[in-house]
Amino acid sequence: SLAKAMYRSYHRYMADYCSADPRRLKGLLLAPGADPQWAADTIRQHADEEWLSAVWPVLPEGLPVDDPDLEPIWQAMDEADLPIMHHSFFYEAPYFPGYRDIWGNVAVARTAAHVWGAQRLMAYVLVSGMLDRYPNLRVATVETGHGWLPHWIIRLTSQIDYVKGAVPADLKHTPMEYVQMGRVFCAIEQHEGPEMTKAVIDILGDGVLMYESDFPHPECYYPDSTDNVISWGPVIGEEALRKLMAGNAARYLRLLSDPWDGSRDGNGRSGNGR
């Protein structure tokens, strides 16, 4: 089909783009939820390629991330140690949850769109038992902000106790416990600043947040984006800064070699030990 041909073309493009130095240049694979078995086969086809570091599940509107039909995708990802990466959308498909209810103000809609898309996916991953069934799975949201995450995790943790019948009876951990286990990650947005970032670290720990530049989009602080975040060190702490700038991403992403190793034949695995 045309859709599958476009997916294949994208993956060839990513492999070619990253081939300049696949130790340092990484990409993600698109896994269409409309055809889970084809998506799983595609993951296995590319699983040993060094450029591949994460998978973006592309879900048709109305299909929840915990739908049983998607299990082949999670199985293939778990086998390859590939994490889930989520990026929300706004005015283009797949539209954000509630996109029909914006009341006409684009600024308000865009403020809500990326966050709510991330919140919904994160919540369903955490309360569905997916992380229990697939012990290598990790999940992250990117370009969705980060200040919302502690409130969402705390509230979600309380709600699965308040509405016990809404989650699997054999769910092994609470959302907060999955965070503390190193299964949840979130990329920062620089406009939220060092104080907000410190608050997230104080509540959830320093193993969650990851640096993000948003290059080459308009929200990037280019050419000062890296120096801008490094300057937050006195506020968030130097150890937390090191993890934010590199360590947490190295744990989250599937890395088949050490990006900081000068050799081209390294066999090191990602920092999470898997």
Positions of PLM-derived features:
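Short coil/turn segments at secondary-structure junctions
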Residues: 1, 110-114, 232-233
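Surface-exposed, active-site-proximal loop segments in enzymatic domains
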Residues: 1-2, 37
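Acidic, glycine-rich flexible loop segments
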Residues: 3, 7
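Mid-to-C-terminal alpha-helical segments outside catalytic/metal-binding sites
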Residues: 12-16, 20, 41-45, 128-129, ...
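Catalytic pocket-lining loop regions of alpha/beta-barrel enzymes
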Residues: 18, 22-24, 31, 37, ...
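Conserved PLP-binding active-site segment of the aspartate aminotransferase-like
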Residues: 32, 214
